[in-house]
Amino acid sequence: FDPSYITKSGKFTHGIGYFYSGCSGKYERGLEIGNFSVIDVKQNTAYHLLATQSKYVKREKSTDDTLMDQYVELLKLTCKTILSISGVLVVDAYFCKNKYITACKDLGIECITRLRDDANLRYKYNGPTKTGKGRRKLYGEKVYFDRLDKRKFNLVHKNSEMKIYTCIANSISLKCDIRVAYVEFLDAKGNIKLTKKFMSTNLDRDGLSIVQYYRARYQMEFVFRDAKQYTGLEHCQARDEEKLNYHFNASLTSVNIAKGIARKGVKKDEEINISISDIKIELSNRLLLDLFISNYGIDPNLQKNRKIYNELLNFGKNAA
């Protein structure tokens, strides 16, 4: 799941307000859609599932209906569809909040996300217990990521790009135990250039798959990019809620159809390079060629025509 900012002018469009734009790094006037996508990890690509327009909530207005409440409500409405496809939901660090993580756990959905840089965690206590009255000790000392205790974090993956350490810890802000994947990204010399922390609500999840699933989430951004560039995601002039909803979902679904065309004849679990621009060019070429063939009475089944026909279908493509 990921929200996306949609540029839109006017005063009377449903839901228009100020939303965060990742491109400009600030709040801008326009619309926002909350989008669920299905990520095929083997194909390394995303397919649109559902887009719902967000309601604008003034930040200075005292109300219980925050944007996060809308995201939680949308999750509840969509959970049956999500669980019918996969039990794993991947979101970015913005959603690493108690309200959203708790909703995922209550709905039986495993949530994978990135922890904040200042995440406050504590180790689970596994030492000897005292006899006598009182509750047994549950938690140990605080987790200091700047001087990580690698006796408690296990190294589960290592290559030339990164090292992944994992541990079960308790999050004070999320009020639950989580599986933590601590990643050290390495430069060409093998020195640590960057560290990031990821988590899963599934305590049995391995650290490597947490990182792989989170990195696969970025395929959603390509769906937004392709829809904005090639299928008119931001070109709707309607102001009505239903018309806008239809347009957003139709535009994003068009990207799915284009990917389906590109993958025709390709094995289900095979990764390929897909250019939506090339697919649009091929479909336009096919339309014009069929028009010429129909009007000029050309037989496309002749051997020499079949070769030329296929060459002209690829005319103007950019991808190799």
Predicted segment positions?
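Electropositive, glycine- and tryptophan-enriched low-complexity nucleic-acid-binding patches
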Residues: 22-86, 177-197, 201
